[in-house]
């Protein structure tokens, strides 16, 4: 279990003062100018050594991502864009940072922008996050008044401006290039790659898009050192991380823990255990709605990190899990997710535009048991045709929960079809 002195987000639950004065008391904005004066290369090398991987779901090494930005300007400005469009069902970790500990994000944005040669950064915040936007804007205004942003930001000699942009509630804008399109005032639709954002991103200029948590942990890593951060977790899965627990746990929460914590320990220590005890566990979606669902047996010894989730044929994602007990109709739960992805498809790619709707309709029939057993395999085959055949990962996100359901809960689907045929279809369980 993570010790309190090792926590980065010390006001995660809003028990303290979120203002600039409160943030300084908790150690933020301490020696920021000295960190910047180390130079771009040393900061990026330190981030690489820390082993920090993107906290938005993809898990790409953060230091390496920063190193893709041009070392010398060709006349175009560079930009940092922070993805605060946290829209995936069950994922609610970044909003706690913005609502209660916004200065971790603002200080991180200054340091990260300097490391990439960017004099401006944009925070693209989800349309529904009204209170979070107010808290973040108030914190930004405080920093401008205190000289921590603007000309000679924090006395570092680096000029830096930070802008907050409110989205309009589209899940697809969480994809980095769709986010850039939306930020430019266009319809949020993913771009073809290459060119990658580091070559031609916002307004055709070099751009890096990072998740809120990825940026917010930067100042603490650089203060305490890469070795400190890398000491948590295991190789390739280093550091501390925000985990979310929702669903049928006794105490749903967002909690900061070390990477590579066993799933069962996370649920029992921080989630207060499964409602009705561990034996009442039926399934877990481990990292947000797009991850393949796991059975109770798989969860018993599963490790919550990138490699651990890959070992059980799922995904670490955002590490915000949905816990389902025996009262859950898991087939209907996955249908609900397929409905979400169908609704949020931008329609640009045919496999996603047509496939998400088709998968949702077949799932709806499977929920009712109004299908043939052979259709289960056909549905699985179609998910494989959608997966990997779209510009962005929304097609994959729609396919994976269904694939996990068929792999791990096929008997439940078949039983429902047989029960419908024999007239034994009972009352449906809770979702």
From Swiss-Prot:
Main subcellular location: membrane
Cofactor note: Binds 1 FMN. Binds 1 [4Fe-4S] cluster.
Subcellular compartments: Cell inner membrane
Binding residues annotated for FMN, in chain numbering: 167-214
EC numbers: 7.1.1.-
UniProt-listed SUPFAM superfamilies: Nqo1 FMN-binding domain-like, Nqo1 middle domain-like, Nqo1C-terminal domain-like
Cofactor(s) annotated in UniProt: FMN; [4Fe-4S] cluster
Residues annotated for NAD(+) binding in this entry: 54-63
UniProt keyword list: 4Fe-4S, Cell inner membrane, Cell membrane, Flavoprotein, FMN, Iron, Iron-sulfur, Membrane, Metal-binding, NAD, Quinone, Translocase, Ubiquinone
Binding site for [4Fe-4S] cluster: 346, 349, 352, 392
InterPro entries per record: ComplexI_51kDa_subunit, NADH-UbQ_OxRdtase_51kDa_CS, NADH-UbQ_OxRdtase_suF, Nuo51_FMN-bd, Nuo51_FMN-bd_sf, Nuop51_4Fe4S-bd, Nuop51_4Fe4S-bd_sf, SLBB_dom
Catalytic activity reported: a quinone + NADH + 5 H(+)(in) = a quinol + NAD(+) + 4 H(+)(out)
Pfam family, one: Complex1_51K
A GO molecular-function descriptor: 4 iron, 4 sulfur cluster binding
Signal sequence segment: none
Topology term for the membrane: Peripheral membrane protein
Record NCBIfam families: nuoF_fam, PRK13596.1
Family under the similarity heading: Belongs to the complex I 51 kDa subunit family.
Function summary: NDH-1 shuttles electrons from NADH, via FMN and iron-sulfur (Fe-S) centers, to quinones in the respiratory chain. The immediate electron acceptor for the enzyme in this species is believed to be ubiquinone. Couples the redox reaction to proton translocation (for every two electrons transferred, four hydrogen ions are translocated across the cytoplasmic membrane), and thus conserves the redox energy in a proton gradient.
Name of this protein: NADH-quinone oxidoreductase chain 1
Gene from which the chain derives: nqo1
